[in-house]
Amino acid sequence: MKGLVKKISAPGLWMENLPIPSHVKDDEVLIKTIKTSICGTDVHIYKWDAWAQKNVPVPLVIGHEFIGEIAEFGKNVKGFKIGERVCGEGHIVCNQCPNCRMGRKHVCMHTKGLGYHISGCFAEYFVLPAENVFSLPPSISDDLGAIFDPYGNAVHTTLAFNLIGEDVLITGAGPIGIMAAAIAKQAGARHIVITDVNDYRLDLARTMGVSHAINVNRESLDNFMQSLGIKYGFTVGLEMSGHPDGLKTLTEKIRHGGNIALLGILPPATSIDWNLVIFKMLTLKGIYGREIFSTWYQMVHLLEIGLNLAPIITHHFSVDNFEKGFEVMLSGQSGKVILDWV
């Protein structure tokens, strides 16, 4: 079978001919891949930057965003059938730590990541624990199923705090930030403002129905707030950029007693004015992945009541042309990029 492998400790990926997994354990499922989506994490691995060099074993099949169908399952697996369309949770948990035993698996203390700690989904077939598999209703397209992982990040972050009638500032108009803006609108926020320095991404946000998309290199956020009647500051902030300036902006523009959820991965030495956090009594909440599986059901329900994410998928490539997919991702001129496996 075909598989995209980080073969050696160097930039790039390699298309390899791999054996189809032949031993499916009693509690596992063998999945035939239909589509995968390229994540920013995959780009880090492709570039082989400092984060990837530190965290990713070599050689490794990468990838964690997928839709596929069940090809085989172990004898203990119940509730699935051959040919069923599925996606899945890419965080493999231990089921033994205190958080897992209390039902809080999204904060497992020993989480392993599909495609960057253990063998991933960028292959024609791959194995996943049955407890991580999520069946998709027919109403959800293959394309949307392939991006359920990042969509779940957006849902988890956006709904971390009450949004009904609130004013929301999102720093970072990458695909997850843009999806977060659409989710916030669906969830009843009053004003939603998203900031970035990439005009392509801001235009994509507008295509997704975000009316307040600001290039902070050219436009004044203060003036924009004034035009919207936001006198005391935003009540909720979502940090999606992973850039120190994004966090700085949020601590300055969120009103006293406001809430900030952080998904973007900031540099380790990022500084913050803790006096603003303390004296404004701000609440900061880190977000990693999705709540297992409550976020997943929210994802389905939001789509069923009209959330439209289709425009966030901007490019499709055959997996044989995966290099072009990564080039588009590296250009910054894309939303989500899909690789077709069948």
From Swiss-Prot:
The keyword Oxidoreductase applies. NAD(+) binds at I176, D196, R201, L263, G264, I265, I287, Y288. Coiled coil: none annotated. GO terms for biological process: L-threonine catabolic process to glycine. The gene is tdh. This is L-threonine 3-dehydrogenase. Homotetramer. It comes from Protochlamydia amoebophila (strain UWE25). GO terms for molecular function: L-threonine 3-dehydrogenase activity; zinc ion binding. The record marks D149 as: Important for catalytic activity for the proton relay mechanism but does not participate directly in the coordination of zinc atom. Binds 2 Zn(2+) ions per subunit. The keyword Metal-binding applies. Belongs to the zinc-containing alcohol dehydrogenase family. It catalyses: L-threonine + NAD(+) = (2S)-2-amino-3-oxobutanoate + NADH + H(+). Its cofactor is Zn(2+). Pathway: Amino-acid degradation; L-threonine degradation via oxydo-reductase pathway; glycine from L-threonine: step 1/2. Catalyzes the NAD(+)-dependent oxidation of L-threonine to 2-amino-3-ketobutyrate. One of its GO terms (cellular component) is cytoplasm. Keywords: Cytoplasm, Metal-binding, NAD, Oxidoreductase, Zinc. Zn(2+) 1 binds at C39, H64, E65. The active site is at T41 (charge relay system), H44 (charge relay system). InterPro entries: ADH-like_C, ADH-like_N, ADH_Zn_CS, GroES-like_sf, L-Threonine_3-DHase, NAD(P)-bd_dom_sf, Zn_alcohol_dh. Pfam families: ADH_N (PF08240), ADH_zinc_N (PF00107). It is found in: Cytoplasm. Zn(2+) 2 binds at C94, C97, C100, C108. Gene3D superfamilies: Medium-chain alcohol dehydrogenases, catalytic domain, NAD(P)-binding Rossmann-like Domain. Its EC number is 1.1.1.103. SUPFAM superfamilies: GroES-like (SSF50129), NAD(P)-binding Rossmann-fold domains (SSF51735).
